[in-house]
Structures are given as structure tokens and as C-alpha cells.
Amino acid sequence: MDMHARISQLFQASIETKQQAMEVILPHIVQASELMVQALLNEGKILSCGNGGSAGDAQHFSSELLNRFERERPSLPAIALTTDSSTLTSIANDYSYNEVFSKQIRALGQPGDVLLAISTSGNSANVIQAIQAAHDREMQVVALTGRDGGGMAALLLPEDIEIRIPAKVTARIQEVHLLVIHCLCDLIDNQLFGSEE
């Protein structure tokens, strides 16, 4: 195997996936950022969840809001539901792994908050239950998905927003998810604190 050629192929595949996605998801990213900004202006917060790499994305997003993205600014209220190992394991042990996020949302979520739900397949059972719990708490949902949107897409209400990456390879979907997260952080900062350009 020519490793240089393989790396070049992977870069090219990532670039092509991002270009294809950009044509489809731009308006949804704008809408999601506006929804999140409105929640923050109304003293709400953003909860986030996902599994595996998507759990890392949920944590990445919340840390960019809680700390900072690319400028000095006040901290913004965001909680990744993927970080408390005691809570996650106790819920999984006493109830079900499918409830590890939904039980937290029922405790922490308030009307007007936003849930950022991340799954490359759209079929993660615990993320699907998180969306159901968010709706029960009168929260709106931003769903980051891929492929055909899976069960998550079927659950979304008209006021929710799906950002679906038109790709099938998990790694390519994850790469675009990270870019979307950075776009959201940038747009949130610019809407709340003004453009730096």
C-alpha cells in the first residue's frame, strides 16, 4: 500500500464530503445557530449528547461555549451529558443504557433549553430517548445526523432542526459534524457579541 496515496485519498474524500454537505446544510446551520442564540438570550442552556466520537463532539461543543471559542467573551451555559461517569454508569446499571441521557434531561432540562443530539447513523437508542425526553421538557432539538437520518429524523418536530450530512462513511460524517460544531460556535459568538471582521 502506498501510504502517501492513501492519505491523499482520505483528504480528498473529506474535502468532497464537506463540499457536498455545504450545498445542503448551510441554511440548517444558520437556523440552528439562531435557535441556540435565542435560547441563550432567554437565559436557557444547551445540553448535548452522543456516543463514542459523537460523545467527544458533544463535549467539544459544550467546552467551546463554557470556556471560549476564538475570542474572549463571557462563558455560555452548556452541559455535555456524556461526562459524568458515576451518573452514566448508575443509570445504565440501575435502569438501561438507553436512558443514560434521557434521565439527565428530565432532571436538568427546562422549557426553552436546546438539546444538541449527535449520531452519525441517527439510530442511537439513547439519543432517540434523549430527544423524546427533550420534547417532554418542552425543549427544542438540533439533531446532527448522517446517512438517512435514522430514527432521530422521524422523531423531530417542525420546530426542531436536523443537520443531516449526506454521506454514508462514518469517519466522513464525523469530520463534517466537527466542522458544523465550529460553525455553530462561530455564529453564536458573532450573533451575541458582534462580528470581529
From Swiss-Prot:
Zn(2+) binds at residues 60, 64, 174, 182. Catalyzes the isomerization of sedoheptulose 7-phosphate in D-glycero-D-manno-heptose 7-phosphate. Belongs to the SIS family. GmhA subfamily. Homotetramer. Its cofactor is Zn(2+). Residues 36-197 form the SIS domain. It comes from the Bacteria. HAMAP family: GmhA. InterPro entries: GmhA/DiaA, Phosphoheptose_Isoase, SIS_dom, SIS_dom_sf, SIS_GmhA/DiaA_subfam. It catalyses: 2 D-sedoheptulose 7-phosphate = D-glycero-alpha-D-manno-heptose 7-phosphate + D-glycero-beta-D-manno-heptose 7-phosphate. Binds 1 zinc ion per subunit. One of its GO terms (biological process) is carbohydrate metabolic process. Pathway: Carbohydrate biosynthesis; D-glycero-D-manno-heptose 7-phosphate biosynthesis; D-glycero-alpha-D-manno-heptose 7-phosphate and D-glycero-beta-D-manno-heptose 7-phosphate from sedoheptulose 7-phosphate: step 1/1. Substrate binds at residues 51-53, 64, 93-94, 119-121, 124, 174. Keywords: Carbohydrate metabolism, Cytoplasm, Isomerase, Metal-binding, Zinc. The keyword Ribosomal protein does not apply. This is Phosphoheptose isomerase. GO terms for cellular component: cytoplasm. It comes from Azotobacter vinelandii (strain DJ / ATCC BAA-1303). It is found in: Cytoplasm.
